[in-house]
Amino acid sequence: MLKPKKRERALFILTFFLALLSVSAVSVDRLKAHVMWLADSAREGRHAGTPGAAAAAEYISQQLKELGCDVQIQDFGGRRRNVVGRIGKAERYVLLGAHYDGQGPGMPSASDNAAGVAVILELLRELKGQELPVSLVALAFDDEEQGLNGSRYYVDHPLYPLDHAQAAIIFDTMGRQFMDLSSWTLFVLGAEYSKELASVVQMRARPEMLVIGTDLIGPRSDFAGFALKRVPYLFFTHATHKDYHGAGDTADRVNYTRLAQDSQLIAQIIQDIARLQSPPKYMDAPIYPPAETDALQHELDVVEKERKDLPQAYRIMFSDFRARLKTDNTRELRRIATSALLALATPRLSGFMVSFFLGPYYERENRRDIAAAIYEEALKWETEASERRALEEKIQALRTPTAK
């Protein structure tokens, strides 16, 4: 007979492998087929209100029907529509959501967010036969890119009562490495508002899954409306890359093997949530993940190691962040460090974030040398003559020694 400790370890291993087997393999081929269809040039970037977006909505509707869903189309004006599918008769449900609109002509919007839609379709296929005690609701939102309009409309006009939702699981910008780094990171946000969801996420934790608070990025995706309605939620993303909102966000650049692997993990998390004995509760006062600072330190280290072209302003900031995060646990510092990572990862937003967030922060901190270096970086992005002059004057003032 096994000794108690060995028996406990054997039981843990058996439980782990049974969990892995409880969901059949997510299909790489099906994920790829969905993304390639949605991101094809014939869809013209799926901008909300266009024929390309309408074709995408029809495609998603047909896929949901083939999966056995009861499908409804929710129009909210301007030729915009949400697609809603439900499987199951149970009153309570887990909601899987992703926006399907894109950036418009010339921008295929494959990772953002054809891949997110592909994930919910494939998860639905894999989970529908698992005899879950809850129903599954798939929500494909329109017009996210212009202000989260589809999801905001849905939470104000839900087709199924929001207080019956076990959780909302939202996907955005999937299938590409954050900042095109060699290592993969799956970011998980939202667990800080529910002890039950945090427990599930912690149980399924793995090194490349980084759990952080949503306040570090702000209301940047469709989880925001559900949070305002106090629906427990998790937001999954692989985050931004060099082609984000650009012509290079093509279907051939999505890593479907990794997308399938992470979808498999998420399927296990959804099963755990579905089988919770008590429904998750939304907490007004968030409990932030204890490993959040370590997650930020890790990303700062990896970026500085891999990005040989890292601008001097970012090297200075990252060095400052790494030193201060060891002793400074304030949310403001964590938000600013995250803003710096996002600015570097999103070239089209870099100038704005550098000028209006990072520079002013270091001015308030009276770190004049760092603020000057940041505004020098902003000059690289500014094309308006008057704005350039204002930046140059600000840099000169910051570089001028102050009287003691």
Question: What are the roles of these predicted feature ranges?
Answer:
Residues 34-36, 45-88:
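A non-catalytic alpha/beta surface segment that caps or lines the substrate-entry region
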Residues 90, 132, 141-235, 255-256, ...:
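Metal-dependent peptidase/peptidase-like ectodomains
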Residues 280-344:
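Acidic, Ser/Thr-rich low-complexity intrinsically disordered segments
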Residues 85, 94-147, 266:
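Alpha-helical metal-binding/catalytic segments enriched in His/Glu/Asp
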